[in-house]
């Protein structure tokens, strides 16, 4: 039997139905890679952050997420190279979709008249997204902005509903605005920690702070 179209599962009509010991035999998600590009780039290397934001309350199938990820990655890799960006998928398909299979194809002599709205068996996975929720985030250099925006614009066509492309005011994937990050970096109050940063805490253990930020305390002494 062919896969039921994702438009049948577009809207959030029911409660979340995740995989559990009561909900078994769930098929694997189609999307397995959530970070791609230059994942090990430091915070200072990619200051610009661009988001693809949902503008509707809906469900995105794992097949659609995988198709959009491939589409955006292929365009940005072809134009600017795979080391020019870091793309992160921000939603995960945990909601299990169900189907009540009934024979209605050419092989059946008559249409099967089963119970309408029956419970059904696990059929696929989808991510439940809210209005204003981030679907994709990409960090890159300022000079690569147009390429990233175009890549996310192409990825939008893989999703139902409406999405917006937003240029973030934050520095990369951190939660600091650009001027605030530069100020803290000059003062030595932040330290690279992969795609994120560690902050100098004004509270807590002094020994840990001295061990994590020796330059800051050496300058104060």
UniProtKB/Swiss-Prot annotation:
Enumerate the Gene Ontology biological process terms.
cytoplasmic translation; ribosomal large subunit assembly; translation; translational termination
Could you list the residue ranges forming a coiled coil in this record? Answer: none
The organism of origin for this protein: Saccharomyces cerevisiae (strain ATCC 204508 / S288c)
Q: Where is this region: 2 X 15-17 AA approximate repeats?
A: 167-216
Q: How does it assemble?
A: Component of the large ribosomal subunit (LSU). Mature yeast ribosomes consist of a small (40S) and a large (60S) subunit. The 40S small subunit contains 1 molecule of ribosomal RNA (18S rRNA) and 33 different proteins (encoded by 57 genes). The large 60S subunit contains 3 rRNA molecules (25S, 5.8S and 5S rRNA) and 46 different proteins (encoded by 81 genes).
Q: sequence repeats at which positions?
A: 167-181, 200-216
A GO CC term? Answer: cytoplasm
Keywords noted in UniProt: Cytoplasm, Isopeptide bond, Phosphoprotein, Repeat, Ribonucleoprotein, Ribosomal protein, Ubl conjugation
Q: Which GO terms describe its molecular function?
A: structural constituent of ribosome
Instruction: Tell me which family the UniProt entry assigns to this protein.
Output: Belongs to the universal ribosomal protein uL16 family.
Q: Which CDD domains match?
A: Ribosomal_L16_L10e
Under Pfam families, the record lists: Ribosomal_L16
> Matching PROSITE patterns, A to Z?
RIBOSOMAL_L10E
Compartments reported by the entry: Cytoplasm
Entry protein name: Large ribosomal subunit protein uL16
Q: What does this protein do?
A: Component of the ribosome, a large ribonucleoprotein complex responsible for the synthesis of proteins in the cell. The small ribosomal subunit (SSU) binds messenger RNAs (mRNAs) and translates the encoded message by selecting cognate aminoacyl-transfer RNA (tRNA) molecules. The large subunit (LSU) contains the ribosomal catalytic site termed the peptidyl transferase center (PTC), which catalyzes the formation of peptide bonds, thereby polymerizing the amino acids delivered by tRNAs into a polypeptide chain.
Residue location of crosslink Glycyl lysine isopeptide (Lys-Gly) (interchain with G-Cter in ubiquitin): 40, 101
User: Which positions carry Phosphoserine?
Assistant: 143, 205
């Amino acid at each position: 039997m062919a896969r039921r179209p994702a438009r049948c599962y577009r809207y959030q009509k029911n409660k979340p139905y995740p995989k559990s010991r009561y909900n078994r035999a769930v098929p694997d998600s189609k999307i397995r890679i959530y970070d791609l590009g230059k994942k090990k780039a430091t915070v200072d290397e990619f200051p610009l952050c661009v988001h693809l934001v949902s503008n509707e309350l809906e469900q995105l199938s794992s097949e659609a997420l995988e198709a959009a990820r491939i589409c955006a990655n292929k365009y940005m890799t072809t134009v600017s190279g795979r080391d020019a960006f870091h793309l992160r998928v921000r939603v995960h398909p945990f909601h299990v979709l169900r189907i009540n299979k009934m024979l209605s194809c050419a092989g059946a002599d008559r249409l099967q008249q089963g119970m309408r709205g029956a419970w059904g068996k696990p059929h696929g996975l989808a991510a439940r997204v809210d209005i204003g929720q981030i679907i994709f985030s990409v960090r890159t250099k300022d000079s690569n902005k147009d390429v990233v925006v175009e890549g996310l614009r192409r990825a939008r066509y893989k999703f139902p509903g409406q999405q917006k492309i937003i240029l973030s005011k934050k520095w990369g994937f951190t939660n600091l605005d650009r001027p605030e990050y530069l100020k803290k970096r000059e003062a030595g109050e932040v330290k690279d920690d992969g795609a994120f940063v560690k902050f100098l805490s004004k509270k807590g253990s002094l020994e840990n702070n001295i061990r994590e930020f020796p330059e800051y305390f050496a300058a104060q002494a």
